[in-house]
Amino acid sequence: MDARFDIVVVGAGMAGASLAARLGDRARVLVIEAEDRPGYHATGRSAAFWTESYGGPLVKPLTTASGPELHRLGVLTPRGALTIGRMGQERQIAAFAETYGGVGIEVSTLNRAEIAARIPDLKAEWTCGVLEPSTCDIDVAALHQHYLAAARKAGVDLWLRAGLAAAERIPGGWALALADGRRVGCDVLVDAAGAWADAVAGKAGVHPLGIAPYRRTIAQVAVEPVAPDALPLVLDVGGRFYFKPESGRLWLSPHDETPSSPCDAAPEEIDVALAIDRFEQVVDRPVLRVEHRWAGLRSFAPDRLPVYGFDPQDGAFFWFAGQGGFGIQTAPAAAVLGAGLLLGQDGGEVDPWPFGARRFQR
């Protein structure tokens, strides 16, 4: 073998980088990444925001617990979020406010006039909404670079173009064959491979959990008049769109979840067209042109909660995957939780029980 480590983390996106940063000063850690740069896939394509309602009430503790570190690192910019509904969707709006207000999120219901004051040129049929004033934009690149730098400072090794080719279970751990020809040993193998999480498990002889990737599309568009910087993140209570301002432009998404194989995701023209059509149903402000479009993969376990913990059938295989679209905003708390579980130490304030792999045990 070329080297031996206590822990090998598969994947150098936000999940793998944040976890490695927490582990590096307490174990000998290697992060392996198949691409030629970290964060090429989901992390590098995220239109991330920190909003406590995103992901549902069970994800909320991870988001809330992550807030202080994200603020301390200076990667949050106040934005506010406004979830809106048409005439006839008042009950959905009321249920949204009751659900998230009931778990401690600051929310307030708005009437038509209050919504229109925040969304210029709002069309008449949008009459009800819920404001989350605490929502912020996240500087994803800065956060990811912080974790990579912290991991490096803590002594973590990062090998690029070194995807996992094969994993053999041996007494006391694993013998790993990498795509670059190197072979390494480790005590614990951590699966932080995002859309490839089940594939990594399969290479290790571990039963996949059904973590499935779904494509999400975003388009950057120019509108007339120019989008105001003070515009909040605007979401549909029915889950059909969201949009937010970005340097005088707008980022639009049709909130698509198209099943996909793990891949270098690319946007489909139909999804870009849907995003524009749904935006123009909300605001009387035509899209002049599409300047950029991209897609990323969001990966979910069958119950749409992340998976953090040792595999129930193999105590040397650790799941750190299935973070869906909320992996960025929950990264600090998830890393603390994951490191605590891995090392048998304090995992912070979040209860790990809802996220354990044991819930899928057959």
Task: List where the protein language model places each region.
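Short hydrophobic core segments
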Residues: 8-10, 184-196, 335
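C-terminal catalytic lobe of FAD-dependent flavoproteins
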Residues: 281-362
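Dinucleotide-binding Rossmann-like beta1-alpha1 core, especially the glycine-rich loop
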Residues: 47-118, 126-127, 240-241, 278-279
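Helical element adjacent to the flavin cofactor pocket in flavoenzyme catalytic cores
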Residues: 131-180, 184-187
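N-terminal Rossmann-like FAD-binding beta1-loop-alpha1 element of flavoenzymes
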Residues: 5-30
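Helix-loop-beta segment of a Rossmann-like dinucleotide-binding subdomain
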Residues: 75-85, 97, 103, 107-112, ...
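Active-site substrate-recognition segment that forms the wall
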Residues: 21-22, 50, 73-80, 193-316
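Glycine-rich FAD pyrophosphate-binding loop
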Residues: 24-43
